[in-house]
Curated annotation (Swiss-Prot):
The gene is gloB. Zn(2+) 1 binds at residues 62, 64, 126, 146. Thiolesterase that catalyzes the hydrolysis of S-D-lactoyl-glutathione to form glutathione and D-lactic acid. One of its GO terms (molecular function) is hydroxyacylglutathione hydrolase activity. InterPro entries: Clx_II_MBL (IPR035680), Glyoxalase_II_hydrolase (IPR050110), HAGH_C (IPR032282), Hydroxyacylglutathione_Hdrlase (IPR017782), Metallo-B-lactamas (IPR001279), RibonucZ/Hydroxyglut_hydro (IPR036866). Its cofactor is Zn(2+). SMART domains: Lactamase_B. This is Hydroxyacylglutathione hydrolase.
């Protein structure tokens, strides 16, 4: 369990598929949890049952199957729910969402305890409807689905490069100590690309060694932090001269704008 010292909220990863995480948030004084992006139900049911917990609510970032497939089965098992009534927050385009939310909305995380509400942030780009959720504690926690990964970001599928760049700029502006909970264990693959862009980065070399050690012991590399990503992630560093020069050298072009650099960096990663 990833427990921030003194934090009233713990966050636990449930691995599913090949490198996905379902995140489970729990107030330390309660036995009900918030489940983030249940792409599969069986592992969540096993965890809930084993730890004698109940589900308070589910929150969803976007509509892809590996984030939503478990919703229906979890909702059908009413005995799993604290109030025997499924509560699913997320984009309105998702069929199983019972409580549609959008940018600027707030979600009560825990009843009867003094914890800030989750803040809903629109983060389109990977998908147009993509939402992220910020828990503004002393050490904030961001659940960002497939928008930001450690040393990487989501592919452009039905969104646009401009949308994704704007979303990542907004995430980058969050407090540096913010913990980032994405839903894929892509870190080593992303570091490989980041080192291609900045081959002289000792910080990337050191981080790769750290992540390899974690993965060797079957431990997640997530959460990361905004501070780390601003130092290492090329998609948050696209305005840096070293990134601009790398992209221009890759394209054999000069004079790219920051928006051009970001777009071509993402296209470079797409074919990497």
């Amino acid at each position: 369990m990833n427990m921030q010292l003194g934090s009233p909220v713990s966050v636990h990863p449930i691995p599913i598929y090949q490198g996905n995480y379902v995140w489970v948030m729990r107030h330390t004084s309660q036995n009900s949890v918030v489940v983030v992006d249940p792409g599969s139900a069986s592992e969540v049911i096993e965890y809930i049952t084993q730890h004698e917990l109940t589900i308070a609510s589910i929150i969803i970032t976007h509509s892809h199957w590996d984030h939503v497939t478990g919703i229906a089965e979890l909702c059908a098992n009413l005995q799993l729910w604290r109030d025997e009534e499924p509560v699913v927050y997320g984009p309105s385009v998702i069929q199983d969402v019972t409580h549609p939310v959008e940018d600027g909305d707030r979600i009560e995380l825990c009843k009867g305890v003094d914890v800030p509400s989750l803040q809903v942030i629109a983060t389109p780009g990977h998908m147009p409807e993509h939402l992220s959720y910020l828990l503004p504690l002393t050490t904030p926690k961001l659940f960002c689905g497939d928008t930001l990964f450690s040393c990487g970001c989501g592919r452009i599928l039905q969104g646009t490069h401009e949308q994704l760049r704007t979303s990542l700029d907004a995430i980058s502006a969050l407090p540096s100590q913010t913990e980032v909970y994405c839903t894929h264990e892509y870190t080593l693959t992303n570091i490989k690309f980041a080192r291609t862009v900045e081959p002289q980065s000792q910080a990337l070399i050191d981080y790769e060694q750290r992540v390899r050690s974690l993965r060797k012991n079957d431990l997640p590399s997530i959460p990361t932090t905004i501070e780390r990503e601003k130092a290492l992630n090329p998609f948050l560093r696209y305005k840096e001269l070293s990134i601009q020069q790398a992209v221009e050298n890759h394209l054999r072009l000069k004079g790219l704008t920051a928006a051009d650099v970001f777009k071509h960096l993402r296209l470079w990663k797409d074919s990497f």
